[in-house]
Amino acid sequence: MLLMDWQGVLSGQPLQWIISGFLTTLWVTLAGVAVATLFALLLLGLRLTGNRVATAVVGVWVSAFRNTPLLVQLMFWYFAAWNWLPRDVITFINAEHPWSVLPGDVWWLTPEFLCSAWGLGVFTSAFLVEEIASGLQAVSAGQREAAIAQGFSAWAAFRHILLPQGLANAWQPIVGQYLNLMKLSSLASGIGFAELTYQVRQIESYNAHALEAFAVGTALYLFFGIVLGMLLTRLGPKSASGKPFRVRTRPFSFRSILHDR
């Protein structure tokens, strides 16, 4: 019978590695979410201009990031693009700065952290802009026509009528993309970033407690995902009653398919 030795993971140096890895995953996820949101909004703005060049730029961005593996992208940013930065910038980032330490003793001004947050962010932005665009397309054309008839300008109609409904339609897929970013942060271990997966593998090499280490790592990812999902749902678009929008779906069945036909 296989006996589990939790003391080999939940005490001493392995425990410190687990805590450090979890906090590092937390911070790089938040940084990646910020980068992804910023770029998704910029890309959405370009697409809404209707300009052919701007639309083409968005199309190339989405195609490039959605159709290449994230691990390859992270390696590109870390091993190739990083060396294109001016030498003074690289020297400044590699130096130790007291103000660059986040709570939990996580250093954010490092090549590994910056490349991981950037890579996760730009990768996720390509998916986010499509989710938001789909949500906006799901808003009926009558909503815009009614807003214009009521005297709203085109921008006011978009800001106060179309965008809130579009975000409500797309919010659950958006939350899913943010959660996916959190899970994909484990790939950053491939460039030597000491997040949770990296630290779990380090414990495996340190004392061969692989099963216990990966069990704890899995539990922490699950905990983080549940908490993050709940927070994002609460922060999402609210209905007039102040409650989060909920998309109503019918249970899947072959009878429903035949009925729709």
Placement of each model-derived feature along the sequence:
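Transmembrane alpha-helices and adjacent helix-loop boundaries
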Residues: 1-261
